[in-house]
Every structure is written in C-alpha cells, then in structure tokens.
A protein has these predicted regions:
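Nucleic-acid endo/exonuclease domains
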Residues: 1-114, 118-150
C-alpha cells in the first residue's frame, strides 16, 4: 500500500470519492453498443482472481475498459506534477495488475481484450466490432471441434 507524502485536502478527498470504478462512462458506452448489436454479456463477474468489466463466458472472452490516467496510458509524458512518488507507485501497480490479470486469464484459455477509455470514446463501434469478431472466431472454433467429433 502506498502512503501519501502530504495530507490530502478535503476537496481532493471528495474528488477522489466521486470517481467510480464500476459503470464508468466508457463502460456504459461500450456496453450500450454491444447490447444494441445483440451481444449479451455479464458485468463485473468474478473470473479466477479477476473481475473483467464485461465478459462473454460462453466464449471465454474478458473485456477491460481501462481509463487512460488510472491504467497508465501515456503516463510517462509527465502529466503528474504533484505528489509524483505516490502517483508513480499507484499507476505502476495498476499497470502491473493489468498485466498479471491478462496473463492469468490467457493461461486459462480466455481471450482478453483491453480498450483505453480514449479509444472507446473515439470509436465505440470499432471497439464493439473487435469484441464481436472475437466472439465469431470462438464460434467457428467451437463448430469445428463439434464437427470433428462426428
């Protein structure tokens, strides 16, 4: 656990409390598009030691919607100015956890898709299509396995 170097102001504390980890705007945007296109999924379902934002368990597909700041996109461009040691440790640990979760799921045969928040906002249709393409690939593999058994 990382300890803050300086006391947190009441305003900062309130700002941090207002940030949600579930049902974020980017998750809702992607989920709406998937639902609109007929994809049915589970939300925040525990799978192994992970909790993907979206999962299609029938085809072992796990989707993570990673906020750009919290998960380290372009982190080393120097956006953080205050309390740098705290944020460096926090963001680095988030990135390590993302990597560990991806490896864990892949080792168990899951397809893991990760989308940056900016990627979802920019082109949610393309993000949804990548998920649908993964589902369709898994469907073909299942059909092939079934026909080989006959």
């Amino acid at each position: 656990m990382v300890v803050l170097d300086e006391p947190v102001s009441e305003q900062r504390r309130n700002n941090m409390k207002a940030i949600h980890s579930n049902n974020t705007r980017i998750e809702l945007l992607l989920r709406r598009e998937l639902f609109r296109r007929g994809v049915r999924y589970r939300v925040n379902r525990k799978i192994l030691a992970t909790r993907p934002d979206i999962s299609v368990e029938k085809y072992k597909i796990a989707v993570f919607c990673d906020g750009d700041f919290w998960h380290g996109k372009d982190y080393y461009d120097g956006r953080v100015q205050h309390n740098k040691a705290y944020w460096d440790a926090k963001i680095k640990r988030n990135m390590e956890r993302d990597f560990e979760q991806t490896i864990l799921l892949r080792d168990e045969g899951w397809t893991v898709l990760r989308f940056w928040g900016s990627e979802i906002k920019e082109d949610v249709v393309a993000c949804a299509q990548r998920i649908i393409d993964s589902i369709n690939r898994k469907k073909l593999i299942r059909r092939k396995e079934i026909y080989e058994k006959i």
